[in-house]
Amino acid sequence: NFGENAGHGNLLALSPYVHPYDFSSEGAFYNMMSYYFRFAQKKKLLNDSTIVILPEYLGTWLVAVNEKKALYKDTSVTDAMQRIALSNIWSFGWAYLNAKGKNKAEDAVFRMKAAKMLAAYQHTFTRLAKEFGVTIVAGSIVLPQPEVKDGVIVLHNGGKLYNVSAVFDRNGK
């Protein structure tokens, strides 16, 4: 905690301590994130001028959303990515055929999971922004050619993968 409250708003950088299970579902991700927001609220660090900044790649780990429980016990990212591919072999195979990156397997996993990742990311940060009345610079997420249309993020699955971060205003847009 640095600085003093001058009543003009503040930047609040949160770096949550996460477990693999925190990315197991949209609900688990929301619960983990809301814990930190409630803590900040309790400490009177949030007001309608607060901008909450979250770390790079936070949303990228949503690649694990809705996977088998064994995945959350894997000890390496490589093992987890292989398990995701094998658990979704047909979807992975199709995505692999359309992969564009240097690492086709990794590219395929992110393309295959993009819609579910985005749903959990967008719903969670929209909800948190509205609930706590703050602007959120959400942690980054790897998605195929994302674009904001009418206040929501949309994907272009044939496009390149980008590591992006979205800003959600106090109204969740």
Task: Please tell me what each predicted stretch does.
Residues 1-173:
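Hydrophobic structural segments
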